[in-house]
Every structure is written in C-alpha cells, then in structure tokens.
Amino acid sequence: MATDTYGVGYNSNTIEGRYNQYARNRELFLERGRECTQYTIPTLIPEEGHSATSRYYTPFQGIGARGVNNLASKLLLTLLPPNAPFFRFSIDNFILKDMEGDENLKTEIDRGLVEVEKAVMEDIEISSDRVALFECLKHLIVGGNCLLFVSKEGLRVFPLDRYVCKRDPMGNVLEIITKETININVLPENIREVIYKTNKPEDIGDKTCDLYTCVKRIKNKFEVIQEVKGVEIPESAGSYPVDKTPYMALRMIRVDGENYGRSYCEEYLGDLKSLENLTKAIVEGSSASAKTLFLISPNGTTRARALAQSENGAIIEGNASDVSVLQVSKFADFRVAQETMAKIEQRLSYAFLLNASVIRDSERTTAEEVKMTAEELQASLGGIYGILSQEFQLPFVRRKIAILEKGGRLPKLPKNVVRPKIVTGLEALGRGNDRNRLVQFLQTLAGTLGQETIGQYVNVSEAIVRLATADGIEVKGLIKSPEELQAEVEQQQRQQLEMEQAQAVTSAGENIASNIPPKTVGETLKHMQQS
C-alpha cells in the first residue's frame, strides 16, 4: 500500500492503484489545461469535483473561444474532408514491378481499391464521427491531450481528466487506463455479487461505481481488461493488434520524453491572459465612465432637490456655475489600452487562423493578397498536421478497415501489400507548394522564352496531370489519354485528307469543263445520255 500526493492510499497491484499512481504525473498537464480553458471555453476542462450545478468563470473577451472553434473547424475539414477521401491505398513497390507487364491486372486492382476507399468513406459519412472529432480537437487545442475510442458504434471522447497513459522514450503508448462512473446495475450479475460481498454497503453509495479499463501493450498486441472495486471483469478481456487498436491517445504538440502533449493555447497563454486583463479593465472603466453624476456646490444658490425634480425644459431658479458633471478623464489611458488590445488581437488572429481579422483593411487589397495570406496561415499548421496524421488519421483508417472487414462489409486486404496513405494535411501542403513552383516555372518560361516554347519543350499532358493532382482532382476520365489524343489526331488527318481529295476532284472537273468548247460539251453530254 502506498500513498499519493493527496494522501489517498492506493494498491499498485490493481488497475485503480496504477491509475492513481499515473495521475500524479498527469496533474501538471491537467492544471495547465484548466488554466488555458479559463480564457477560452471554461466548460471544456472544468475543475475537479464539478457537477451540473457548478458555476463557471465567464471571460471578458471572446476571441479565445472564437479562435478555438475556428481552428478546430479548419482542422476537422482537413482531417476528415466532407465528400472527399482523405486517404488513398498504395501498393507495395515490389508488387508493382511484378505487374508492369500486365496493365489489365493493375487496372483491375486499382478499381477494387477505389471501391474499398468508397466503402470506408461512406461508413464515415453516415456516422457521427465528425461530431466527436470536433470535440476532441477542441480538447487538443486547449488541453493538448485527448483519448479517442473507435468502435463500430462510432467515436467516443475521453478528456484528459478521465484517463492516464504511459509512453516509451520514442513516444509509443505502453499503457492507457480510463476511468468512468457507471451504474452498478449495468455490470454482470456475478460481478455485482462479488462487489457486494467484498465491499461494505456504504462504500457502494448511490449504486454508482468507478469502472477502470486498462489497455496494456504486450509485444505486438494491446491486452484489455476492466476492473470495478478491485474486481476484474473476465468478460471484458480481449486483445487487439498494435496497428488496429481502438484506443488512440492523441497529442497536439509532442515533447520528447513526456507522457502527455502540450496544448496549442499554452504557446499563446501570455497573449490570452493580457487580452483578458486589458478587456476587463476597459469594460469596468467604461462602465464607471458611463455613470453620470451631477455635483451641486454646497455654497451655491441652486437647490439639488429642485434640479432633481424638475422636468425637461422646466424653468427653475439657480446659478449654472453651481452645477458640474463628474468626469473620469481617463480617455488617454483607455486609448493606450485599446491600442495594445488591438495588437494582441491581431497576433491571436494569426495564431488561430482568423483570416478575416488579419487581412489588410484597404481599398487596394487584392484577391491574390488574400489568397497568399490564407496560404501562409494554413502552412503554419504543418507541424500539427504531421503529428495528427500519424497519431490519428492512419490509426483511424486502419481501425475502420478492421471493423468493416470483421463485419463482412469489406474483403480482407492482403497484409503488407496494400497500405493506406494520407493525402490531406501535410501531404496537401506539399502538393500545394509543388503546384506553386510548377505554375511559377511555366509563367517564367512563357514570359522569358515565349509561349511557343511551352508547346515545343514541355510535356503539356504531364503538366496538366500534375496541376490536377496538386489540387486533389481525380484525373481519371477527365484528362484525355495519349491513345485518345492520337486517335483524334489521326481522325483529323483523315478528315483533312478527304477534304483535300474532294477539293482536288472538284478543281480537276472545273479545269476539264473550262477547256472543252460549249458545242463539244453539249454533244458530249448528249452522247453520255444515249450511252
């Protein structure tokens, strides 16, 4: 028996004991997340012991909440774009070499993989995965950590205060323990009997108990077991391959050697705090300045009661110099605070990709400037795309495929032959840079050497395919193949030849007719009719 930082005893041999032990390492990250949520969305990571009747802090500024929701929406549209696949299946290079001589086989395999991609995307479209992922992304932005459970029913989100995890030095997950509060009546009957025998009635309380789920990596599998009141539930035991586990412990920003990640808001916490304090000062100062008070000289002839009870436009006795209005006279101070707020808001707008707030307010702002600003902001998320593609997108696709294969809705794909490849996020940023370089190269070539140089030296078909690929457009059936182009050229040549032959025949007939005398022509026609 050991004791944690709060003086609560725990048994490290039980799942609950290990949870309490790991929770000590999590506390620093949890406190930091709660500090960030105070200036963004206070209900996201509430204080310990909160309930439905808890009162939450209301921030004086709303740019934190607006920025979190905006950034989460942009990440959601990038990670799971609607009506568009975010992954492609790629075939092993050695297998591709074996199929080089058989184009029909390669085409058939590509067609089958496209059907599998459509089936996976259709399952995602009809599910509520995006709703849960949006909540998860907000937790990642504010708290830096979140746990996703992917089942056939959909996604489930575990905030940082409901799970602990342990990683190896490379960042791979070794153990995850979740904590849930459930009604004891949902447990199997044999487990309920053991709990009632091993625990006092007052320990069970209002028939709710904490359910602990342990997910531990053993070699190439994750072993799962659940525990209630120190009693393991045999029916919950199971195992998953490492690459198909339903438990995904996500991080926003990876820090080497730490079990948990850092949040996006933590990097801008100073600006959020400063903006909150300045906004609070200006709001409270403005409220004080808006209060109107009339001062009456105690030695004057004007009566305060007569002034207070008089109606608008009334005539009363008094001296105007006896009456004055109380003013705060803090306009200059408020102006300095307002200018500082504007600079902080602009910095936060860049950080949270609030494009409309960072566009230069000018009549000469061009569409190209707006586009370049948006691309610059999007490129700043390259590191976040990188970690989310490896820790969420790839495991999510593998898990979805495993669920569909187990349900008989997908054929079993050959292992180590066909692999999913992410085509959004960081990959899309790379394709966008390739597109910009290609367009710039073609423009430079045309402007320096002339338009005819492109048609003479550049493979136009390949350039068109690369531009379409960079924009994520499927070229199959859209761009004409070399065979189709060759057939069109041959058809045009045949039509041109037929037109030339027809013109030659017509021209020859006209020449013959023009060289025969009219009388001879008539006789010739008559002879032709008789014959």
Label every model-predicted segment:
Residues 1-28, 295-531:
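C-terminal anchoring/interaction modules
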Residues 1-194:
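Extended, helix-rich architectural segments
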Residues 4-5, 57-60, 91-110, 117-125, ...:
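Charged, low-complexity surface segments at secondary-structure and domain boundaries
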Residues 11, 20, 142, 150-310:
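Structured, contiguous alpha/beta core segments that scaffold functional sites
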Residues 34-39, 68, 110-152, 260-295, ...:
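Long, contiguous amphipathic alpha-helices that act as assembly "spine/axial" helices in icosahedral shell
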Residues 69-79, 88-95, 103-106, 225-234, ...:
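Short, mixed-charge, low-aromatic patches
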Residues 74-82, 269-285, 443, 462-469:
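Short, hydrophobic/amphipathic alpha-helical patches that form generic packing surfaces
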